[in-house]
Amino acid sequence: MLRIARTLNRSPLASPLARGIHQSTPKTNPSPLLSSTPTQYSSMKVASLKDECRRRGLRLGGRKADLIERLASHDFSTVSKRAVVSTPNPVAAPAQTATAAGATATLTRVRLITSSAPTLAQGDTSTIDFCKLPHTGMPADAPRIKIPTSPDAYGEVARYGSHAITNDRKVAESVAEDELHSKQPQEIHYASGHVVRSFAGDHSSETGDHDFSTNDKLVLGGIVGAVGFWWFLGLEGKVE
């Protein structure tokens, strides 16, 4: 399996099969398998890798791929610590072996992912830079349109309550009082000294005595006499 992977890496037509991950916070200890830059530990033997792990104080167990990943992670963490911690008077580091120098030169070309969010507390590992909350306020209601309406009796009672009923009663009482005064006799004084009393009002329901003329009396008398004579003749025929 390692031989096939080594052959693909040496092939000029082979494209890197690494996938980049966008992250807003720095990752201090990434896996070297996600890096597109090949490391120099691939050409070393297992014994050499174990010696290097023993020199750095790392665990010796595992396969060759595990040893390579362990060494690459240690190199990356060392470079990250050097980039974060800055000293005013840097001291020259002791000379390292050619293998360590090559690993450092390879890892310096890796661009570190930084975050725009400031660290608010010690050990803050949050991956959220900012959040946007939706606007939860309800919109204001539109102003009501006032429409004028024609006045009516129900509206007056509903608006003014018992005052409208009291006013209607007063008006009805005043009208009745006026009608009562109009039915009382009124005296009219003339210049000659005569006094005439007149009644004003509705006389349609009053019944009065009407004088009949002479012709009317004769006609009515004739009708009554004819009816009486006819009745008398009928009664006389029944007796016989």
Swiss-Prot record:
Localization (cell): Mitochondrion membrane
Membrane-spanning residues: 218-235
Chain intervals for the UniProt region annotation (Disordered): 13-48
UniProt entry keywords in alphabetical sequence: Membrane, Mitochondrion, Transit peptide, Transmembrane, Transmembrane helix
Residues annotated as domain SAP: 41-75
Main subcellular location of this protein, as a coarse class: mitochondrion
Superkingdom to which the source organism belongs: Eukaryota
Record bears the keyword Cell inner membrane: no
The protein's name in its UniProt record: Altered inheritance of mitochondria protein 34, mitochondrial
Organism the protein comes from: Yarrowia lipolytica (strain CLIB 122 / E 150)
Record gene name: AIM34
